[in-house]
């Protein structure tokens, strides 16, 4: 098998052996493999769906905001392979009236990291469904 001839989805399927190649191709940027794959897949799916805005991934250091639409809408992207997503440690416990992002994209994987579905919540929907830290 020539690893250079694999497409991105094949690389993702082989991820335990291919972390370096994934980084070289710009698919992941950090060691947070699940989060990085979720961001990559969200960006890809939004790009190819004419009903959704194209997303630009932000710098890894941007607090709570993973991507921005061409209209300036801020997106948080969370990936999960269980029934719970990660926490937002920089968000206050109580609603302080500040909108920290307009949309939350949930990229949901199976336990084998196969994409199951992508969900999008507004900020208000996120506030209704989130669990406290």
Question: Whereabouts are the PLM-identified features?
Answer:
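Nucleic-acid endonuclease domains
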Residues: 1-74, 78-133
